[in-house]
């Protein structure tokens, strides 16, 4: 009789355990520390990513896995030191092609784009002879996605400064970034007045600052024409959401023209910093082998 009771108790225990099953992962990204997926099949997904003197010290094997895992339609890169190394990397990533400019010998700007979803119509640089505001000339990419045209303007602004705009010093870092914004605004309003424009990159300054030393006022003063899609991050920065966490700074930005306001809203106003270090399972490993910047991405619908 005791053996029968034991068998019954074991059966009851097994039934209870099997009924519990596995926890259902409602949001895989929050539960899987290696998940860095950003893009969807129904949106135009654009990312900016400073790769910190690529390929110096870069874990190429990991980076070649991370890029398709992000699942962006276009990624704009900064700090590409070796043209051939970047092109070789692109050749090893299925379904992606590369554009790298030659306007500078180092700290180049570049793009990777998904050839299944994006067509590149044209690529060119502007302000090549204006190195004071633009130590790296802006790199434009004219693309078609879902039968619509878009203009991306990839930038890497002058770094450093002291949170003071000295208009009397032509080499003042903040003044140079301020001039870069003013000239980009002029170029867009003059040459691309009705285009869907995305200005993005490592802009090396913060957008949520007092007017007296905010270098982005030429854009911020025109809310009917421009919007920084990452502004919610900038006004509430934390270690977990900024693009440059080592100094708790958010300096990588995505600006859209008013032709994209509805598309941004239609995609849920979704712009965020991608915690790419999750792929490496630690910030220190990521910072040492990939970059000291996190990628920032935006979704647009059509």
Regions found by a protein language model. Give the residues of each.
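Structured beta-strand-rich core segments of catalytic domains in phosphoester-bond hydrolases
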Residues: 80-158
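Hydrophobic pocket-lining residues within nucleotide cofactor-binding pockets
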Residues: 51-54, 80, 125, 157, ...
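Bacterial N-terminal signal peptides that target proteins for export
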Residues: 1-8
């Amino acid at each position: 009789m005791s053996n029968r009771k034991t068998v019954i108790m074991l059966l009851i225990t097994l039934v209870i355990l099997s009924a519990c099953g596995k926890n259902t992962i409602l949001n895989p990204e929050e539960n899987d520390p290696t998940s860095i997926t950003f893009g969807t099949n129904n949106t135009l997904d654009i990312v900016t990513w400073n790769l910190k003197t690529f390929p110096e010290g870069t874990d190429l094997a990991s980076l070649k896995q991370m890029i398709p895992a992000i699942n962006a339609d276009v990624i704009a890169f900064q700090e590409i030191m070796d043209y051939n190394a970047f092109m070789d990397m692109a050749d090893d990533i299925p379904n992606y092609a590369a554009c790298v400019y030659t306007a500078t010998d180092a700290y180049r700007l570049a793009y990777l784009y998904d050839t299944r979803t994006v067509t590149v119509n044209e690529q060119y640089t502007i302000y090549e002879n204006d190195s004071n505001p633009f130590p790296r000339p802006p790199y434009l990419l004219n693309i078609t996605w879902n039968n619509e045209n878009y203009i991306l303007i990839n930038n890497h602004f002058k770094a450093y400064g002291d949170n003071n705009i000295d208009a009397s010093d032509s080499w003042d870092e903040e003044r140079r970034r301020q001039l870069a914004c003013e000239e980009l605004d002029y170029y867009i309003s003059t040459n691309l007045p009705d285009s869907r424009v995305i200005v993005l990159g490592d802009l090396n300054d913060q957008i949520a600052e007092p007017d007296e030393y905010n270098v982005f006022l030429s854009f911020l003063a025109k809310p009917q024409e421009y919007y920084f899609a990452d502004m919610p991050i900038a006004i509430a920065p934390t270690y977990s959401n900024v693009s440059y966490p080592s100094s708790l700074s958010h300096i990588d930005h995505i600006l859209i023209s008013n032709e994209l306001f509805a598309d941004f809203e239609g995609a849920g106003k979704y712009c965020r910093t991608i915690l790419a270090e999750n792929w490496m399972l630690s910030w220190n490993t990521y910072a040492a082998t990939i970059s000291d910047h996190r990628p920032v991405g935006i979704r647009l619908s059509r």
